[in-house]
Amino acid sequence: MAGHSKWANTKHRKAAQDAKRGKIFTKIIRELVTAARLGGGDPASNPRLRAAIDKALSNNMTRDTLNRAIARGVGSDEADNMETIIYEGYGPGGTAVMVECLSDNRNRTVSDVRHAFTKTGGNLGTDGSVAYLFAKKGVISYAPGLDEDAVMEAALEAGADDVETYDDGAIDVYTTPETFGDVKDALDAAGFVAESAEVSMIPSTKAELDAETAPKLLRLIDMLEDSDDVQEVYHNGEISDEIAALL
């Protein structure tokens, strides 16, 4: 299936995201520690840990760093007070937004999240207000330049649910959360190096943003990601190439 890839929507934010790499590493390490503490240090029997490892490697974290984080999780109780919290709300332009947090203080976290929504013209909703618009899936993304047919054949043979190809040559492979690790292993073994790989919340519908609402949504995302407690921000906003070029 051909279409418009997320590359155009994300490339203009790359410099800002690179500047946050230290914060990203801190969040990934927190997730590695928590996943190892709750489910053990073997990724083969701990899907949450496997997903965290894939995310760490996609962000160029060294094996040494991630192994130390796993060892910390297995050998300590520092993750005992951590809990995963999902907040839902509506952002600028009526976009549906889900915020995945890992926190030891709910009051602090909800205050940070609510502040970000309020400052950008959105509002924090109740449980279930937008969750029905998203599905949890594994997403393995490839940069333009690979043989699309070969990736598709290998992915479907490995058990992927769907493969989406885009006009610019980028490829997204979709899996269930349960088959994510096996499919990625098979694609790695076939020589296809992913640009990113993670279990994500994928929107079923998109909200097209205009020149006024697009920067507001990006500001909301940036404010949320600035919170140490926020691990992931999912949304259904879509920004056209023309508007992205202006941002």
Swiss-Prot record:
Pfam families: TACO1_YebC_N, Transcrip_reg. Keywords: Cytoplasm, DNA-binding, Transcription, Transcription regulation. One of its GO terms (cellular component) is cytosol. It comes from the Bacteria. One of its GO terms (molecular function) is DNA binding. Disulfide bonds: none annotated. Gene3D superfamilies: 1.10.10.200, 3.30.70.980. GO terms for biological process: regulation of DNA-templated transcription. InterPro entries: Integrase-like_N (IPR017856), TACO1_YebC-like_2nd/3rd_dom (IPR048300), TACO1_YebC_N (IPR049083), Transcrip_reg_TACO1-like (IPR002876), Transcrip_reg_TACO1-like_dom3 (IPR026564), YebC-like (IPR029072). It is found in: Cytoplasm. SUPFAM superfamilies: YebC-like. Belongs to the TACO1 family. This is Probable transcriptional regulatory protein plu2109. It comes from Photorhabdus laumondii subsp. laumondii (strain DSM 15139 / CIP 105565 / TT01).
